[in-house]
């Protein structure tokens, strides 16, 4: 993090008017200075219902089928859902990672390690792949358990059902 920016933020927090409420959001709060964190109250925001995110996307002009898919993929996070609308490459990368997973499942160990080695060279891509794969395995485990919880990867329902069937 940039020290000058962090110090400016700290000064803003310390000198804010008494009536002011500042909301600070961070994807990686561990990168904030401890002095900043100590002056904040941490609120963990829960995702919105999928239906609310879907309705918001429809209101913004997204067709119903796409809005439903993006709302599920977003996991109830409206900001992420809007980014999925604005940046089609996010959905393309997600599909790529899920296709990679399908290819790797029956692959030989050497191919899996080769893929892992390639992925380890790009930390952002690795983090992205792990996040996407975790959502996929979450869906599989929900189906194995017989839970009625909505899937994140609704567009992969047939694959998920098939894999869940093999695991029971």
Task: Give the location of each predicted region.
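Conserved AAA+/SF3 P-loop NTPase catalytic/coupling segment centered on the Walker-B
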Residues: 1-10, 29-33
